[in-house]
C-alpha cells in the first residue's frame, strides 16, 4: 500500500428532516363492448420537504508510518432547505380490438406548482485556517442560496397499435405508435415514434425473438431546471427556461429460450442494446443527493449486454443467474467521461431449493459481484469525478423450516384453515463480512489537497424471521 494515511474523526450536531406526501386518484371507465372502453383518470399528489441540519466534524490526518501531521481541523455543514410541490393530472384512455389489432390512444393534461427556498453552506478549517485561505478576507468553501417558483402545464397524447399475425415464419406481434408532448414553461414540443416486433418461430416454439427501436424523451422536472453556477465556492441558482428534454434513440435486440433440465423448467434470456444519447443534462452524486447542472451540455451513449438464466427448483419461486456488461459515457466540452451510472459489470445469483428428500427444510443463497461507480469530490467539475469505487461483493445465506404446510388445505378448522404456509428462518447477511464502501468523506489539508475517506456499509448481520403465507 502506497501513501497510507491515518484518519480519526468525531462528529456532533443534529439533522431533522420532514417529508410529507399525499396521493389521490380516481378512475371512471365506460365499456362500450367487451373489447372497447373509454376511461377518465384523475390523480393528484402534494409533497412538502424540509431538510434541516447542522453537522460538525473534527478530524486528525496523519501519515500512517510516522508522526507527521497533515491536517487537524473542523468542518461544519449547515442547511435550511424547503420544497413544496403540487401536481394535478387528468387523462383519457381509449382501447379497442378488431381483426388482430389492439388500438390504444390517450390524452393527458398535467398542472405543476413548485416552490423552493434553499440555503446551504459548508465551512472547513485546517490547522486553524479557514479554507480556502486568503489573507485579506474570510470565505466559505461552499455556499448556496436558491429561491425559485415554477408553474406550468404539460399536454401529451399517444396513439398505439398492436398487430398479431401469422406467417410461414411463425407468430408475429408488431407494436408501433407515436407520442407527442408539450410543456408551456419552456415552450418545448417533442414527437416520439416507436416500434417493436416479436416473433415466436414456427420452426421452434421454445424461442421468442424481439427487436425494438424508437425515440424516448425524459422531460425535465424541477431538479433538472436548476442551473447552478459555482464560482469560488459560491453557488448561484437560477431556473433555465431554455432547458430541453434529454433524448435517447434505443436499439434493443433480444430473445428468450425455454427448456427443461433435470425435470425442471428453465428460461434463458439475452438482450443486446445501444442507446444514442443527446441533450444530456449532466449530474453528479453527493452521497445520495443528485445535483444536475441544469443545462443541455453533453451527448453520449450507453451500450450493453444482459444475460439471465431462470430455473424453478421450488414451485412458484424462480432461481436465477444474471450477467450484465455495460458501458455508458458522456461527452462534455470535447472530453469523454464515464457517466455516474457506469457500472461496467454485474454478476448476481439467487438460488433457493429444498434439502434433498425434504419439503420442510429450504436453503437460499445470494451472491453479488458488481463494479464500483465513478465518484469524485463534492462541488467539483464533472471532469474531476472519474475515480472509481472498489467492486461490491456480498454473500447472503439463509435456512428456513416450514412449521405448517397447508397447501392441500387439509386444515379446515380454526386459524389453520386460513394459513397456507408458516416458516421459521435464520439469515446471515454479508456472510463473509466484506467491507463494501457506501460513500466517501472528503478531508482537506492546509495545502487544499483532498483525501477520500471511505464510509463502509454494514458488515455481517444475523437475522431471525417468522413468516406466514395466507
List each model region and its residues.
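Short loop/turn motifs that connect adjacent beta-strands in outer-membrane beta-barrel proteins
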Residues: 31-37, 97-102, 165-172, 202-207, ...
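Face-selective signature of the C-terminal outer-membrane beta-barrel domain
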Residues: 18-186, 269-272, 320
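Residues that define the transmembrane beta-barrel architecture of outer-membrane proteins
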Residues: 18-22, 84-88, 151-155, 189-191, ...
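C-terminal beta-signal and adjacent terminal beta-strands/loops
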Residues: 369-378, 401-470
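Transmembrane beta-strands of outer-membrane beta-barrel pores
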Residues: 44-48, 98, 109-115, 155, ...
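Surface-exposed extracellular loop regions of Gram-negative outer-membrane beta-barrel proteins
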Residues: 2-6, 202-251, 265, 272-292, ...
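Membrane-embedded beta-barrel scaffold of Gram-negative outer-membrane proteins
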Residues: 37-53, 242-301, 424-429
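Gram-negative outer-membrane beta-barrel transporters
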Residues: 165-169, 273-276, 295-377
